[in-house]
Swiss-Prot record:
This is Disease resistance RPP13-like protein 4. Its main location: membrane. The keyword Membrane applies. Disruption phenotype: Increased sensitivity to the pathogenic biotrophic bacteria Xanthomonas campestris pv. campestris (Xcc). Reduced resistance to Pseudomonas syringae expressing HopZ1a. Exhibits autoinhibition activity.
Length: 852
């Protein structure tokens, strides 16, 4: 990944030299020399990345170069911080004057001298590497084709090809089973064959959903214990029990399933330790049609779980026709799966033949080509690269790994760093997308291009990996926005191997720059890794980290730490004391404390975190106060205080954080002692705003137009939980959201009729609308538009609105572009084309949803 490290560094250096020339004048010569050498070396670094896999000398040289660039980048940040480059103009001006102080001269000289030494060492590495690459000149540097080709996911991961027969067969087994017996089925086959996909198709089938009162999905990693598996089953049943012993857990499972027809899927079971199976198997109730599906790569596992041979399904490779169809669905996803260029069809079929019918391989190569230019010479180059990777393989598994290696090799440089962060997460872990994106921004992996903001560019990176089928979507919102994801275990194997060789991360936590915190964390891993750049909570759903306060003291030894995510953690001391220690980490750019306890307030010492760009304290229910020093974080891009129920208001001065792109959980003050809504109008870079409005006096009359000129704002969420008073309804009704708004969410709205501005005339660009909970009974007349004015809404969600009355036909007439409607717990919407709308509800879809 040295090409990724160099690319990120060059981008930062270029920006600093162009925009901050005065503050780096002491080091300008060294930076320019460094920039020149690295630009030249970019021309062969990608080839060096490939060749180092078989050349020990090259591997060592590339590793040395990577470490030198890391050090140069750290010096660069030190220079910026020392010169006051934190976005605060007054501080920057004063800091520049302080550079003239005699006490500063030795420090400046030391940094300048070290940059000079790094330059000399890099020049030497260049001379040693050059002989491996002939005819290389700086003009040979190619661009990363497809880097910005798609800014949102294009390929629909729910599309399934060639597995209809498999699904039909399994459903027949389930429906014909003897209810008096426990049915055990096994899906057996190599990784990447589609076992999990078949199980998901069956699990999510409507007929299966109606037949089984309880459906449970458990991802069984190689390191799972019987206790973890039992707790996972209980979480599927809505029970987040803690502290119980195994016997109690098993009895609870029995109680939940007794008298119910149930289906349990045990996905990806390995044969290393199956002692857990006997207890669970013996404890499962019989006599009401219970069924268990086990997916595994091992025939011995199928026998061990007592799956009869006639109930063991062995998926076959895809046929040539289905292989081509799946490839087209991915590679030509932007063209509805149609290949319209004969020259691409020929080379495409040649590539598909090399995939040998393996779905994971086909999707990986198809996703790669989706993101490349659709021209013959580029596809021919990829075909030859693929052939090189396949050479010498002796098994189907080798072929899958070769396709994944090809996909990694062909990634744009910055996406290589992004994908390697997934090496930190445990097997089968469901990963929050925002955690990934925030970490990428904090570490500087995200390239801001084509006028895209930092957060938008971070989303683009995620889409780039999703379109390449390297990340699998787990959960989406009604609007198609991805919430959580995961990676296939074979993709995980690849990124762990690369990350370990490049000292990015290491499962043993040694000699690396990134660590994942999960469960009871071994603090020694921090002690032996003082060069850490990222520490991320990788706890699985429903679990927490239990950390002690001594950990904070060890964090302070990692002075170059950029990302610290200790979300979903419980500490044995007040978190303010721990944050007091963390405040010394001046390179810190991303700090996540989401769902961390006990956090009551931030310490004043946090004012020293001048490099902070992302601060996430969402779901900290005990947080009562934000220190005024938060307004000093002039680089802040994201401030998330969602669901901080005890927080009274924000401090004055939030309006000075003009780089903010995302502000969530914002509670306008009820008095002049805190931040008023009027300050928000200064945040002209806002893309996403979440308001918490509970009292009418949070908004003054003269503040009602505070949102109208936020020209970049795309999403607004208004949460009125625990509100009272007609005055609040009047104030919300008089607000003026900006016309270009793309997505709107109303939660716990107290009014009986919709706000007057909720109309296609006032919000002509609105694409997604969500109204959840509250007292809404009807929509005001402007909501329905007229024959000349219609909504452009594509996605609508209505939830927990017990009194809302709305006609389905009238709704469709006013929303002609509607593609999907999600509705539940809305008993008065009887005319809707959604089954059980008054209870669990469902989704109506006109056509497959594509984000525009």
């Amino acid at each position: 990944m040295v090409d990724a490290v160099v690319t990120v560094f060059l981008e930062k250096t270029l920006n600093i030299l162009e925009e901050k020339g005065r503050t780096v004048s002491d080091y300008r010569k060294q930076l320019e020399d460094l920039q020149s050498e690295l630009k030249y070396m970019q021309s062969f670094l990608k080839d060096a990345e490939r060749q180092k896999r078989t050349n020990e000398t090259l591997r060592t040289l590339v590793a040395d170069l990577r470490e030198l660039v890391y050090e140069a980048e750290d010096i660069l940040v030190d220079c910026q911080l020392a010169d006051g480059d934190d976005g605060n103009e007054q501080r920057s001006s004063n800091a520049w004057l302080s550079r003239l102080h005699p006490a500063r001269v030795p420090l400046q000289y030391k940094k300048s001298k070290r940059l000079q030494e790094i330059n000399e060492r890099i020049t030497k590495i260049k001379s040693q590497v050059e002989p491996y690459f002939e005819f290389i000149t700086p003009s040979n540097v190619g661009r990363d084709n497809g880097t910005d080709r798609w800014s949102s996911p294009v390929y629909d991961h729910t599309q399934v090809v060639g597995l209809e027969g498999d699904k039909r067969k399994i459903k027949e087994w389930l429906f014909r089973s003897n209810d008096s017996q426990l049915l055990i089925m096994a899906f057996v086959g190599m990784g990447g064959l589609g076992k999990t996909t078949i199980a998901q198709e069956v699990f999510n089938d409507k007929e299966i959903e109606h037949r089984f009162e309880r459906r449970i999905w458990v991802s069984v990693s190689q390191t799972f214990t019987e206790e973890q598996i039992m707790r996972s089953i209980l979480r599927n049943l809505g029970d987040a029990s803690v502290g119980d012993d195994i016997g109690t857990l098993l009895r609870k499972i029995q109680q939940y399933l007794l008298g119910k027809r149930y289906l349990i899927v045990m996905d990806d079971v390995w044969d290393k330790n199956l002692s857990w199976w006997d207890k669970i198997y013996q404890g499962l109730p019989r006599g009401q049609g219970g069924s268990v599906i086990v997916t595994t790569r091992s025939e011995s596992v199928a026998k061990r779980v007592q799956a009869r041979d006639d109930k063991t399904h062995r998926p076959e490779l895809l046929s040539p026709d289905n292989s081509w169809l799946l490839f087209c669905n991915v590679a030509f996803a932007a063209n509805d799966g149609t290949c319209e260029r004969p020259e691409l069809e020929d080379v495409g079929k040649e590539i598909v033949t090399k995939c040998k019918g393996l779905p994971l391989t086909i999707k990986a190569v198809g996703g790669l080509l989706l993101c490349k230019d659709h021209v013959y010479h580029e596809w021919r180059r990829i075909a030859e690269h693929f052939q090189d990777e396949l050479r010498g393989n002796t098994s189907e598994t080798d072929n899958v790994m070769s396709s994944l290696q090809l996909s990694y090799d062909e990634l744009p440089s910055h996406l290589k760093s992004c994908i390697l962060t997934l090496s930190l997460y445990p097997e089968d872990c469901v990963i929050p997308k925002q955690q990934l994106v925030h970490g990428w921004i904090g570490e500087g992996f995200v390239m801001w291009r084509n006028g895209r903001s930092a957060t938008e560019s971070g989303e683009d990176c995620f889409s780039g990996l999703t379109n390449r089928c390297l990340i699998e979507v787990v959960d989406k919102t009604y609007s198609g926005t991805i919430i959580t994801c995961k990676i296939h275990d074979m993709v995980r194997d690849l990124v762990i191997d690369i990350a370990k060789k490049d000292s990015f991360s290491n499962p043993e936590g040694l000699n690396c720059r990134h660590l994942g915190i999960s469960g009871n964390f071994d603090e020694k891993q921090i002690k032996v890794n003082h060069k850490l750049r990222g520490v991320v909570s990788t706890t699985k759903t429903g679990e927490v980290n239990k950390l002690n306060s001594d950990l904070a003291k060890k964090f302070t030894d990692c002075k170059y730490l950029r990302v610290l995510d200790i979300s979903k953690s419980i500490f044995d001391a007040p978190l303010s004391e721990i944050l007091d220690e963390i405040a010394s980490l001046q390179h810190l750019a991303c700090l996540s404390l989401s769902n961390t306890h006990p956090l009551i307030q931030f310490p004043r010492s946090m004012e020293d975190l001048h490099n902070l760009q992302i601060l996430d304290a969402s779901y900290c229910q005990n947080l009562k106060q934000l220190q005024p020093c938060i307004v000093l974080f002039k680089k802040l891009l994201v401030l998330d205080m969602t669901n901080c129920g005890s927080l009274e208001c924000f401090p004055k001065g939030i309006g000075s954080l003009v780089k903010l792109e995302v502000l969530l959980g914002f509670k306008p003050a009820r008095s002049n002692n805190g931040c008023k809504l009027s300050e928000v109008k200064n945040l002209t870079n806002l893309r996403k705003l979440g308001l918490s409005l509970t009292r009418g006096d949070q908004i003054e009359e003269e503040e009602l137009d505070s949102l109208i000129n936020l020209s970049k704002l795309m999403s607004i969420s208004i949460n009125c939980y625990d509100s009272y008073g007609d005055d609040l309804i009047t104030k919300i009704d008089a607000l003026t959201p900006p016309h270009q708004l793309h997505e709107l969410s109303l939660q716990f709205y107290p009014g009986k009729s919709s706000p007057s501005w909720l109309s296609p005339h006032k919000l002509p660009m609105l694409r997604y609308m969500s109204i959840c909970s509250g007292n809404l009974v009807k929509m005001q007349e402007p909501f329905w538009g007229n024959e000349n004015t219609h909504w452009r809404i594509e996605g609508l969600m209505l939830s927990s609105l017990s009194d809302l009355d709305m006609d389905w036909e009238v709704l469709q007439q006013s929303m002609p572009y509607l593609r999907t409607v999600t509705a539940n717990w809305c008993p008065e919407l009887e005319s809707f084309a959604i089954e059980d709308v008054g209870f669990r509800g469902g989704v109506w879809m006109k056509t497959p949803l594509h984000r525009t």
